[in-house]
Amino acid sequence: MIPIKHLFHISSPQEEVFDALVNTSKLSAWYTSKVEGGNTQGDQLTFSFGEMKFIAEIEELIQGTKLVWKGLQADVPVEGHRFIFELDRNGDKTRVRFTHEGYDEQDDSYANMNYSWGKYLESLRQFCQKGKGEAFGSPAYRI
């Protein structure tokens, strides 16, 4: 398997960054404006990107430090993929390690997803640091 990995820092408390990952109203500010579902382990989340939907299960949740989504159903080939967010402190910043597991090759789908995750993770950083993200479907979203 060939994972997508991103490592970056956010100048916000770790608890606030984690809350932005699990609170659906905050997810809708940085990821996609249409998010439905729960926020505890075993719950499902439905993310809408225009006509495209992505349904994930919260496979693992360790409060404040780790969140894992497992892709259940999607209009892109990510069923069974795992999306892992790991947080810790690094000085006065929150370090975020993101991993998307599930690709067998670095094809166009992999490249597109890698680019998209970079964009959304920067939106997460902007939301946590400045209070405004660039979620898909929001006025701030850049195509």
Summary of predicted features, one role per range:
Residues 102-143:
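A conserved amphipathic terminal alpha-helix motif
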Residues 29, 78-82, 106-112:
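A short, polar/proline- and glycine-enriched secondary-structure boundary/capping micro-motif
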Residues 39-45:
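Short coil-to-beta transition motif at edge beta-strands of beta-rich domains
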Residues 36, 48-92, 97-104:
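Hydrophobic-ligand binding "helix-grip"
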Residues 1-36:
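Hydrophobic ligand-binding cavity/cleft-lining segments
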Residues 13, 46-50, 112:
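Alpha-helical scaffold segments that form or flank carboxylate-/histidine-based iron centers
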Residues 17-21, 27, 45, 58, ...:
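Hydrophobic pocket/interface hotspot
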